[in-house]
């Protein structure tokens, strides 16, 4: 029986020259599944990502956060989802260029050349943009002295390990899914949880809101509404008080040693924005039947792509990955007919 090595291909930091069928920019869930779909069609691909590991936001920001809308998984953490996707693409042994940004893209369909910030050159017949939020970073609250508390870890924008907050008094600021989800996830771990939002109404999934109301009623979290962040108190990076205020100027002091502001991510497409692609509010517009952009041979999938009716769901990114892969096949093999087959019939190409 053939043994499959599930260790990921090595990603050298030395500049490389790679000739391949498809360059995938972005190694989050959509990019990884695109690699699988291309591999199933016997197409070669290379994964390129600015982060030092694959997984995108799932791995970098939310490895322990449960995801509830992946088919066949009642709940799966972001980290476990990425591990499963890596196992799925392991048989194809696709190279990875990590800790790099794509700086330039030249050429036309069938003959693209990409260069990276590490000096790599990639020649590809087609390009798949699975860049998620682009080069993402948190929207930071405008508070005096914020940098010192960021440096000490008293102010954090991502939760990588829930255990890091055991026994701590935590202020969570924000009114969206991330704020609500982490308030629920830190129950039973943090000693005290305050949730600060400038409005009384939160914007999150209905089931999550119902759980938040139950948690507040049970005293597991305290909802501090309608308040917004006003100031931080402490010394030498050690946080002791988070000040919040109403629009009328009423100030309240919350004793806490950690602040988690969840005000979303700022999106920066970087050089991608200069490639002549049709953009709509920092997203790339595509033909939803093929996931192709206005530039022939360049496709976009996942959160970076937009079209009427688009849902920013991981599972939709998976669907877009499959459509893009099938649309790319005739670009790479124009004289070869592609007959659609189910994986139950074909198996995984060896």
From Swiss-Prot:
Molecular function as annotated in GO: ferredoxin-NADP+ reductase activity; flavin adenine dinucleotide binding; NADP binding
Catalytic activity: 2 reduced [2Fe-2S]-[ferredoxin] + NADP(+) + H(+) = 2 oxidized [2Fe-2S]-[ferredoxin] + NADPH
Annotated EC: 1.18.1.2
InterPro entries linked to this entry: FAD/NAD-bd_sf, FAD/NAD-binding_dom, Fd--NADP_Rdtase_type_2, Ferredoxin-NADP_redctase_2
Cofactors that this protein relies on: FAD
Statement: the UniProt record of this protein carries the keyword Nucleotide-binding: no
Protein residues bound to FAD: 49, 57, 62, 102, 136, 303, 344
Record's keyword terms, sorted: FAD, Flavoprotein, NADP, Oxidoreductase
Pfam families: Pyr_redox_2
Domain of life of the native organism: Bacteria
Cofactor: record remark: Binds 1 FAD per subunit.
Protein family (similarity comment): Belongs to the ferredoxin--NADP reductase type 2 family.
HAMAP family referenced in this protein's UniProt entry, alphabetically: FENR2
PANTHER family registered for this protein in UniProt: THIOREDOXIN REDUCTASE 1-RELATED-RELATED
Subunit structure: Homodimer.
Name of the protein in question: Ferredoxin--NADP reductase
Species per Swiss-Prot/TrEMBL record: Granulibacter bethesdensis (strain ATCC BAA-1260 / CGDNIH1)
Native organism taxonomy: Bacteria, Pseudomonadati, Pseudomonadota, Alphaproteobacteria, Acetobacterales
């Amino acid at each position: 029986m053939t043994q499959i090595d599930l260790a990921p291909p090595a990603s050298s930091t030395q500049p490389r020259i790679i000739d391949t069928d498809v360059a995938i920019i972005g190694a989050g869930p959509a990019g990884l599944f695109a690699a699988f779909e291309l591999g199933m069609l016997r197409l070669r691909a290379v994964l390129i990502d600015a982060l030092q590991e694959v997984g995108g936001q799932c791995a970098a920001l939310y490895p322990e956060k449960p995801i509830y809308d992946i088919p066949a998984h009642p709940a799966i953490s972001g980290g476990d989802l990425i591990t499963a996707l890596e196992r799925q693409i392991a048989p194809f042994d696709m190279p990875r260029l990590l800790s790099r940004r794509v700086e330039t893209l030249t050429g036309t369909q069938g003959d693209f050349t990409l260069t990276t910030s590490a000096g790599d050159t990639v020649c590809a017949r087609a390009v798949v943009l699975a860049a998620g939020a682009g080069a993402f970073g948190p929207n930071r609250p405008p508070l005096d002295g914020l940098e010192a508390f960021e440096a000490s870890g008293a102010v954090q924008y991502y939760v990588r390990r829930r255990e890091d907050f055991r026994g701590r008094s935590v202020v969570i600021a924000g009114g969206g899914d991330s704020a609500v989800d982490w308030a629920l996830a830190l129950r039973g771990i943090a000693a005290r949880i305050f949730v600060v939002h400038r409005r009384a109404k939160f914007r999150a999934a209905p089931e999550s809101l119902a759980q938040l109301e139950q948690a507040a009623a049970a005293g597991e979290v305290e909802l501090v509404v309608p308040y917004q962040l006003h100031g931080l108190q402490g010394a030498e990076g050690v946080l002791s008080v988070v000040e919040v205020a109403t629009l009328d100027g009423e100030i309240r002091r919350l004793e806490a040693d950690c602040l988690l502001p969840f005000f979303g991510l700022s999106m920066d497409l970087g050089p991608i924005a200069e490639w002549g692609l049709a953009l709509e509010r920092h997203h790339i517009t595509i033909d939803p039947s093929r996931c192709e952009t206005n530039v022939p041979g360049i496709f976009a999938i996942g959160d970076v792509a937009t079209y009427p009716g688009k849902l920013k769901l991981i599972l939709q990114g998976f669907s877009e990955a499959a459509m893009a892969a099938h649309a790319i096949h005739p670009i790479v093999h124009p004289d070869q007919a592609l007959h659609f087959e189910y994986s139950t019939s074909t198996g995984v190409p060896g």
